[in-house]
């Protein structure tokens, strides 16, 4: 799968109803990884308050790279999620934006990455992250695909949030005694 039509078809087949959000996000993350042959791992970082966490991942490299950023409090996935900007790292060995993180990521085999913000209503709630063990392999087409996946992640989270609101309202309504 290397074009937008194939990506959209794969994402449209993701079933949202009657599933846990984590399962849906894991499936979307796997689709992202397959859509971009140059990447070896993908993850979704969500940020609640100032606390980041990996909501889904496909490939241990992604989880390891995410954790390295969380330990430091900065890095491309966290900055994408906070600043609503795309961050592409062509080569961790020479990137100077996050020198401590980049050095440790390279030591763990991550040589390039892409982090795309997750838009949700009027905010950014995290990032879609992709990682590769080779430098300079993520191109503009990968950025385009990642932005599309990020939009689908936002839809899944929006649907889960709405379903949670509806369920809470049903519980609240059921708790009110009938006045008949």
Question: What residue ranges belong to the model's regions?
Answer:
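Short beta-strand-to-loop transition segments that serve as allosteric relay/switch motifs
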Residues: 127-136, 141
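Short hydrophobic beta-strand micro-motif common in sensory/regulatory domains
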Residues: 112-119
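Short hydrophobic/aromatic beta-strand element in the GNAT-like acyltransferase core
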Residues: 41, 102, 115, 127
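Signal-transducing coiled-coil/dimerization helices and immediately adjacent hinge/linker segments
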Residues: 162-180
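Regulatory sensory and allosteric helical modules in signal-transduction proteins
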Residues: 55-56, 62-111
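Allosteric cytosolic regulatory segments
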Residues: 143, 147-154
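Helix-loop-beta substructure at the N-terminus of cytosolic sensory domains
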Residues: 1-9, 13-57, 64-66, 74
């Amino acid at each position: 799968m290397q074009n937008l039509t194939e990506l959209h078809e794969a994402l449209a087949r993701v079933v949202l109803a009657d599933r846990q959000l984590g399962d849906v996000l894991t499936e979307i993350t796997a689709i992202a990884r397959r859509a971009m042959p140059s990447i070896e791992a993908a993850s979704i970082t969500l940020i609640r308050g100032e606390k980041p966490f990996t909501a889904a991942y496909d490939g241990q490299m992604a989880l390891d790279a995410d954790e390295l950023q969380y330990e430091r409090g900065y890095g491309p996935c966290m900055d994408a999620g906070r600043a609503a900007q795309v961050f592409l790292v062509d080569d961790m060995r020479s990137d100077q934006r996050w020198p401590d993180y980049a050095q440790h990521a390279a030591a763990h085999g991550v040589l390039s990455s892409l982090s795309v913000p997750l838009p949700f209503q009027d905010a950014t709630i995290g990032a879609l992250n992709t990682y590769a063990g080779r430098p300079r392999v993520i191109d503009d087409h990968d950025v385009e695909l990642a932005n599309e996946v990020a939009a689908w992640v936002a839809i899944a989270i929006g649907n889960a949030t709405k379903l949670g609101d509806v369920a809470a309202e049903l519980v609240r309504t059921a708790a009110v005694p009938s006045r008949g």
